Amino acid sequence: MKQIVKKLVESLPVVSDYYAYHWLFPRRVNAFRGLYSSFDEALKAVPSQTLTGYNHAELHDAPVRLNCTQADMETLNPIDYPVLVWLHKAFEDSSIVCDLGGNTGNSYYAFRRYIPYPENVQWTICDLPEAVKSGEAMRQRTHCPGLSFTTDLATVENAEIFLTCGTIQYMNASLPDFLGHLKNRPRHLIVQRVAFYEGEEYFTLQNIYGVYVPYKIMNDANFVASLAALGYELVDRWSIDRPCVIPFHPDRFVKGQ
């Protein structure tokens, strides 16, 4: 009976949206709701009793809390295979990496099973304090040459490779604006797991394990053009089958990331 009711609800657009907005969103990880014109507006829409932002230990300390081994950390997410291709190529002439939002070192550990790192690699993860704290704890327990952690965005100034996997959509500032203010820009940019579509940029809210965070959906063409204006050339792109569905706003649907 429950399945019949569920199918009926999902088949009626308005009812389905109401169900997704009020019932599914608080209960489902990575669910979305709301349409906002700015980061601050989205932030104000978070209920007062709900955690917001990404700087919470429970979002970053799983590897330490679960006593993960080095082998556990080296598990590759299949959606990151395209990153391996271009990081390997970037390592031909570069060895200094700034991994923005690299959490506890997920990419550093996973990628090295598949591609050789330069002997002089410097891989700096720039993230929030709680992520850095957990990352440092893991670093003490593993063999990880060249890996370091920081909360200082100035690290990007020295980077030759700028890597970010699923982070810039949580930032208020745009990546092109941020890079545009640097005196020394990275030679290579690798941007992964970011939601783009053809419409006007907007913010929504995402549920991440009970924490509500503003989430930016960017205009594809504008993003590419802004980076091109800084001298960067788009050499490849790929899509991940992870849609963003915003209840009551079918025109803001994002097919993949």
Task: Give residue spans per PLM region.
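Membrane-proximal basic amphipathic "stem/tether" segments
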Residues: M1-V46
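Class I SAM-dependent methyltransferase Rossmann-like catalytic core
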Residues: D40-D93
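Conserved class I S-adenosyl-L-methionine
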Residues: S94-T104
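Class I SAM-dependent methyltransferase SAM/SAH-binding core
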Residues: T104-G146
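A short SAM/SAH-binding and catalytic strip from SAM-dependent methyltransferases
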Residues: E160-S174
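A short, conserved alpha-helix within the catalytic core of class I
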Residues: Y170-R185
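Conserved beta-strand signature within the Rossmann-like core of class I S-adenosyl-L-methionine
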Residues: P186-F203
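Short alpha-helix
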Residues: V213-S239
